[in-house]
Design a protein with these regions (language model features):
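Surface-exposed, flexible loop/turn segments at secondary-structure boundaries
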Residues: 69, 140, 182, 191
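Intrinsically disordered, low-complexity terminal regions
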Residues: 1-14, 70, 218
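Beta-strand/loop edge motif enriched in small/polar residues
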Residues: 68-73, 78-86, 102-105, 126-128, ...
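Extracellular beta-helix/beta-solenoid repeat scaffolds
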Residues: 14-75, 86
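Detector for repetitive beta-architecture
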Residues: 13, 24, 34-36, 41, ...
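Conserved small/polar residues in nucleotide/adenosyl-binding loops
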Residues: 221-224
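Short, T/G/N/S-enriched strand-turn elements that build extracellular solenoid repeat scaffolds
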Residues: 3-8, 23-31, 47-53, 107, ...
Length: 224
């Protein structure tokens, strides 16, 4: 621990609980090290990202069953590369049966530079920018989400590599309020099942191609 930063530099499982104000958990492990963090009833607020993963093989973030966990940065977040409440430069998986509340006060709620997998859990995400800002690939399965973003709601976008920027959604109940795009993929967008409602946006669903294989309801509002 150094000043207001707790650094995780080795592989392992780390269980975190309780409240903190002004402390960042930073994951800076070797590229061969997988890091598993279990959130077990956490409320974390910080000037910059509450959790920031800058190096590791893969980071796993588990929401403990029955717990509510909250992460927030601040409007004065000075880290332009990690302008989110939760940031990962490496592949990130979020799973579990708990609840995660995210408040992105500087820009984004969750920002992932590589691939983001989300399996299970309930999510309430607000952001002054994008709720989800993912670079390469976004897969969301078996979740319940309420999203309120001033810009894009759920976004994966890669301007440099057209082979990525893909999104896969299955068995979710997701409600999005967005100032710009509700659900956006620069690559292929595939929806297999679930209910997706975009209450307010300039574009409800956007992708290089959009494939809807099933689902109870896929609805969106396109405002002009």
């Amino acid at each position: 621990m150094s000043d207001s930063t707790v650094t995780i530099s080795k592989s392992g499982t780390y269980v975190i609980s309780g409240q903190s104000d002004g402390i960042q958990i930073k994951i800076a492990a070797e590229k061969t090290d997988d890091v598993h963090i279990v959130l077990k009833g956490v409320t974390m607020t910080n000037t910059n990202a509450a959790i920031s993963a800058t190096s590791a093989g893969h980071v796993y973030l588990t929401l403990a069953d029955g717990t509510t966990n909250s992460l927030s940065d601040s409007a004065s977040n000075s880290d332009e590369k990690a302008d989110a409440a939760l940031f990962s430069k490496v592949d990130l998986t979020i799973n579990g049966k708990g609840t995660l509340n995210i408040d992105g006060k500087k820009n984004n709620g969750i920002k992932a530079n590589d691939t983001l997998h989300i399996t299970g859990g309930s999510y309430n995400i607000t952001a002054v920018g994008d709720a989800f800002n993912v670079n390469d690939e976004l897969n969301i399965t078996g979740t319940t989400m309420t999203i309120d973003a001033k810009e894009d709601g759920v976004k994966v976008d890669n301007d440099e590599d057209t082979s990525v920027g893909t999104m896969y959604l299955s068995d979710n109940t997701i409600t999005v309020t967005a100032g710009d795009d509700g659900i956006h993929a620069s690559g292929d967008l595939v929806i297999d099942s679930g209910t997706y409602t975009v209450k307010n946006s300039t574009e409800g669903l956007e992708g290089k191609s959009i494939t809807i294989n099933g689902g109870d309801t896929v609805s969106y509002t396109h405002l002009t």
